[in-house]
């Protein structure tokens, strides 16, 4: 009986996954959607591929004695505070670097594992074309690819496959 109850609870859970190229992207590109869906009862998880430590932290780099680790720590705290302010369920950091963002097969499989774990009702990521930031375009491509892999019965067949959640694309 307990198992059946647990299964029912899991199927009624509403969740969403935000795939963000840089730690600050989710805040101003889909922060309103995150806050709204949390309020509607969704568990919104954010996954940041990088901290934006090279290309999106100019003010920090202008400070004396700045190091890559200090920038990453600062950006992580900022993103965690933003996620908390939006009432996000969880935030994850893959620390893949940026400018350029590079997402290899191992990192893609980590994203697939996260997608399968969350089983999102919908996903959000960057728009398909951003002439000013190729990291964002790569994130879109990877979001589409990892969603596809998460749906494949032959990829780690012992795991629960993903249904077919809609992928919404955001930009300011």
Predicted regions and their residues:
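Metal-dependent de-N-acetylase/amidase catalytic core
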Residues: 3-19, 90, 101-172
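Active-site rim/loop-helix segments in enzyme catalytic domains that contact anionic ligands
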Residues: 6-118
């Amino acid at each position: 009986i307990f198992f059946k109850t647990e299964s029912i609870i899991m199927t009624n859970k509403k969740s969403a996954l935000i795939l963000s190229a840089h730690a600050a992207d989710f805040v101003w590109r889909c922060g309103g959607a995150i806050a709204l869906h949390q309020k509607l009862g969704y568990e919104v998880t954010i996954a940041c591929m990088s901290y934006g430590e090279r290309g999106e932290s100019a003010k920090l780099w202008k400070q004396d004695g700045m190091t890559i680790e200090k920038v990453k720590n600062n950006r992580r705290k900022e993103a965690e505070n933003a996620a908390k302010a939006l009432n996000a369920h969880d935030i994850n950091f893959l620390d893949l670097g940026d400018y350029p963002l590079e997402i290899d097969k191992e990192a893609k499989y980590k994203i697939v594992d996260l997608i399968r774990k969350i089983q999102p009702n919908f996903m959000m990521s960057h728009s398909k074309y951003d002439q000013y930031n190729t990291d964002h375009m790569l994130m879109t491509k990877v979001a589409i690819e990892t969603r596809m892999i998460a749906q494949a019965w032959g990829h780690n067949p012992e795991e629960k496959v993903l249904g077919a959640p809609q992928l919404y694309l955001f930009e300011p």
